[in-house]
């Protein structure tokens, strides 16, 4: 099927040049031919039922009922979120029969926009780690090379996008879970500013490390899905009241007026794989040729203290959400070692350490506010290593530097998370071994629209869609 984007598919359905039934059949055929190898989509719905739902969407359209831009689009939700009628396993055998009776808020909005839910996208066990493997569904393979990992925790979503199994995808992000798999599979991952996409489950006041967000093969699709997912909800007291407008309100910025601060590896603080910074810097240099100003940016911040801040807040957050599984010795023994370690560490969090972490986080935010007085956006790699062996759970060292935790190799993502600012991962290119990488851009708080308009301009100047042809030669 020839189309440029999910937004293009939407227009074709609205104009009746493509039927929902035809799209569903093509999608199911594509999944049949690619998913057995990649393992991106799990918990698939019955095919005949999906085709019937697609026909119902066509019938509704024939009667003048158009539900929204996702009318008839097949969609699979990340397997950490609830959709009615599908198991939310979170990649854990302990939750293999967890059948919710209602949609999560953002999924309800996607359903209301007309999407047809076809299944779930694969994740690491209980969403922890940036490698999408679990004992329930298995490992998701990289879109460009099945010997490599897909990243995570939205690994299934990113691979399904890159492999054209889904028109657009949702994900979530605490420690780069939208950004890392986007980078590893040459797609776009957008972590909205905190509160932009409301969350109504769990701690609605202090649970501000993770957020849902959109992924796409192009920026326009990411914007469209964000507009569906975003918007204030009375059940989410910290959700943004300001509306983002419509798709037509988003215009590419002039790159000649953009000043980017390159954070790189924070002056050799972060260990990075050889060639990774070069890949990102080459893309920034290309931005410079079209008029953007690129400058090295030294924030003069104690990054080691930010890591300790992160550990404390993450331990505390996860203990609150996963403690029931840890308290029961039977279920605790069935959790992967990394999850057991994370929850065990939470027992050592004190009121003093929590207060200190909050102070460091506040100072980090103030540091970025000062930086944004000079720069429009801050840039840094989306990961510290290129995609690695799918059989390896996580990198234990980077260029001779040992990683002391299972997630230390993703430290590059915590600054964006802790700031609460919007962050987008855009394709940065490939290394000499044809492994993809992405580059993160952090925007000021509340400036999600401005960051996405920059991303539109980036995509126009440095398009990446032709790179998907590499998949057929490497998979």
Q: Could you describe each region identified by the protein language model?
A:
Residues 1-52, 289-290, 467-475:
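An N-terminal boundary/leader segment
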Residues 8-15, 95-98, 210-217, 344-349, ...:
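Short, well-ordered beta-strand elements within core beta-sheets of diverse protein domains
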Residues 17-25, 55-58, 272-299, 322-330, ...:
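Acyltransferase
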Residues 27, 50, 72, 78, ...:
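Conserved hydrophobic/aromatic pocket- or pore-lining residues that grip, position, or stack substrates
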Residues 33, 112, 162-264, 281-286, ...:
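Structural helix-boundary/capping segments
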Residues 39-45, 237-244, 258, 264-266, ...:
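Flexible, acidic loop-helix segments that line cofactor/substrate-binding pockets
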Residues 70-90, 252-263, 313-369, 381, ...:
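Short helix-loop capping/hinge segments that flank enzyme active sites or metal/cofactor-binding pockets
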Residues 70-212, 263-265, 382-401:
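Short glycine/serine-rich loop/turn segments
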């Amino acid at each position: 099927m020839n189309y440029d984007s999910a937004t293009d598919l939407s227009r074709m359905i609205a104009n009746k040049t493509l039927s929902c039934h035809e799209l569903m059949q093509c999608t199911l055929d594509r999944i049949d031919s690619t998913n057995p190898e990649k393992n991106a989509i799990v918990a698939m719905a019955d095919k005949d039922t999906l085709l019937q739902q697609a026909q119902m969407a066509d019938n509704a359209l024939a009667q003048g009922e158009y539900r929204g831009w996702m009318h008839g689009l097949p969609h699979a939700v990340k397997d950490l979120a609830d959709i009615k009628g599908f198991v939310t396993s979170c990649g854990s055998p302990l939750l293999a029969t967890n059948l919710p009776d209602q949609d999560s808020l953002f999924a309800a909005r996607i359903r209301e926009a007309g999407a047809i839910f076809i299944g779930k996208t694969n994740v690491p066990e209980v969403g922890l780690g940036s490698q999408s493997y679990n004992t329930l569904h298995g490992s998701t393979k990289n879109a460009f090379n099945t010997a490599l990992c897909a990243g995570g925790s939205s690994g299934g979503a990113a691979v399904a996008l890159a492999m054209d199994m889904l028109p657009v995808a949702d994900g979530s992000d605490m420690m780069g879970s939208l950004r890392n798999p986007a980078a590893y599979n040459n797609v776009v991952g957008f972590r909205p500013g905190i509160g932009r996409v409301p969350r109504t489950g769990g701690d609605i006041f202090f649970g501000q490390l993770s957020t849902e967000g959109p992924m796409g093969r192009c920026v326009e699709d990411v914007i469209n899905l964000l507009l569906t997912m975003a918007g204030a909800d009375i059940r989410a007291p910290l959700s943004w009241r300001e509306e983002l407008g419509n798709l037509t309100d988003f215009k590419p910025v002039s790159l000649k007026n953009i000043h980017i601060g390159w954070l790189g590896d924070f002056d050799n603080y972060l260990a990075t794989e050889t060639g990774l910074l070069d890949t990102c810097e080459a893309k920034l240099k290309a931005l410079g040729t079209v008029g953007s100003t690129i400058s090295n940016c030294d924030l003069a911040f104690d990054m080691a203290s930010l890591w300790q801040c992160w550990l404390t807040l993450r331990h505390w957050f996860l203990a609150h959400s996963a403690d029931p599984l840890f308290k029961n010795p039977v279920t605790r023994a069935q959790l992967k070692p990394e999850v057991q370690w994370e929850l065990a560490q939470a027992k050592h969090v004190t009121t003093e350490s929590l207060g200190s972490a909050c102070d460091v986080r506040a100072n980090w935010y103030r540091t970025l506010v000062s930086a944004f007085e000079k720069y429009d956006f801050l840039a840094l790699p989306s990961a510290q290593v290129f995609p690695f062996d799918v059989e390896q759970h996580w990198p234990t060292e980077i260029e001779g530097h040992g990683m002391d935790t299972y997630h230390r190799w993703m430290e590059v993502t915590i600054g964006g998370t802790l700031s609460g600012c919007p962050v987008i991962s855009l394709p940065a290119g490939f290394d000499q071994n044809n492994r993809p990488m992405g580059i993160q851009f952090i925007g000021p708080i509340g400036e999600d629209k401005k960051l996405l308009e920059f991303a539109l301009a980036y995509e126009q100047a440095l398009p990446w869609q032709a790179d998907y042809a590499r998949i057929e030669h490497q998979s």
